[in-house]
UniProtKB/Swiss-Prot annotation:
Protein name: ATP synthase subunit c, chloroplastic
Pfam family, one: ATP-synt_C
TM annotation in the entry: 3-23, 57-77
Entry keyword annotation includes Metal-binding: no
Misc. remarks from the entry: In plastids the F-type ATPase is also known as CF(1)CF(0).
UniProt organism field: Stigeoclonium helveticum
GO CC terms, sorted: chloroplast thylakoid membrane; proton-transporting ATP synthase complex; proton-transporting two-sector ATPase complex, proton-transporting domain
Keywords: ATP synthesis, CF(0), Chloroplast, Hydrogen ion transport, Ion transport, Lipid-binding, Membrane, Plastid, Thylakoid, Transmembrane, Transmembrane helix, Transport
GO molecular function: lipid binding; proton-transporting ATP synthase activity, rotational mechanism
Site (described: Reversibly protonated during proton transport): 61
Alphabetical list of InterPro entries matching this protein: ATP_synth_csu_bac/chlpt (IPR005953), ATP_synth_F0_csu (IPR000454), ATP_synth_F0_csu_DDCD_BS (IPR020537), ATP_synth_F0_csu_sf (IPR038662), ATPase_proteolipid_c-like_dom (IPR002379), F/V-ATP_Csub_sf (IPR035921)
Record localization: Plastid, Chloroplast thylakoid membrane
Topology class, membrane: Multi-pass membrane protein
Amino acid sequence: MNPIIAAASVIAAGLSVGLAAIGPGMGQGTAAGYAVEGIARQPEAEGKIRGALLLSFAFMESLTIYGLVVALALLFANPFAGS
């Protein structure tokens, strides 16, 4: 494998995981903050708020997992490496 392609693949894999984690990380922090605020304001709605929060966390975390899949594809099944 060409060393330039190998180096670019490693850099791209690191960037894909890092950048894919920034957005969901900030979103989860914001959502958790608003959930705590909502529960503090209306404690009887805790169950509904928690359910919606966990579902939204799952959707946000799926974006990070997609970034991890792209990174693993670049590292172990690199389509740019050729034969």
